[in-house]
A protein has these predicted regions:
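Short, solvent-exposed polar/charged micro-motifs at secondary-structure junctions
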Residues: 1-5, 105-107, 146-148
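Helix-centered, glycine/charged polyanion-binding patches within enzymatic domains
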Residues: 70, 75-141
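Hydrophobic (often cysteine-bearing) scaffold residues that line and stabilize catalytic clefts
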Residues: 54, 116, 148
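Structural motif
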Residues: 22-25, 137-147
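Polybasic low-complexity intrinsically disordered regions
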Residues: 1-90, 98-99, 151
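Charge-patterned, long linear interaction tracts outside catalytic cores
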Residues: 150-159
Length: 159
């Protein structure tokens, strides 16, 4: 939450003030964008300031994936233009959950999206249980090290 945002010395400015639509609240800090395998092991991730939208880091995250892979995302990753450019640049298909007023995905993509949604939510809850939202680091480098350690622990937990 943004209660202590003015007192924070590690990060300053409006770049770190974001809005979480799922929780319908504002927050101050970072967003973690994570790509996992169907077994829940992290493959690629990036930390982004809270202000920026979900589609900003998706090109960077998909460059490490082999061509022909399909990435499933939530409603924040809905963009036909970005999905087409990612497919052209890296050969990775981006399938995002559609909003109610949009044309639905193909039936097999919807079926796979529902199947992998449980894995996505499980990984998110595991990260919350590890205390990722309450990391108390003195420097930004220390914060990044703690995020690395949490993701390493997650990959070991999901072997």
């Amino acid at each position: 939450k943004r209660v202590r945002a003015r007192r924070c010395r590690k990060v300053r400015g409006l770049d770190f003030c974001g809005y979480c639509a799922a929780k319908k609240e504002k927050f101050f800090g970072w967003r973690l964008h994570l790509i996992c395998t169907p077994q829940g092991r992290p493959v690629s991730y990036t930390l982004l300031a809270g202000r920026y939208q979900d589609l900003a880091p998706i090109h960077e995250l998909t460059f490490v994936l082999p061509p022909g892979v399909t990435v499933y995302g939530d409603k924040g990753y809905v963009s036909a233009d970005d999905a087409a450019s990612i497919l052209a640049d890296t050969g990775v298909r981006l399938i995002a959950a559609r909003r109610t007023n949009m044309e639905p995905n193909e039936w097999h993509d919807e079926m796979n999206l529902k199947r992998y949604r449980k894995t996505i939510e499980t990984v998110n809850s595991q990260m919350e249980k590890m205390g990722l939202q309450r990391l108390h680091a003195r420097t930004n480098e220390g914060f990044e090290i703690k995020v690395h350690a949490s993701l390493f622990a997650l990959s070991l937990a999901n072997l």
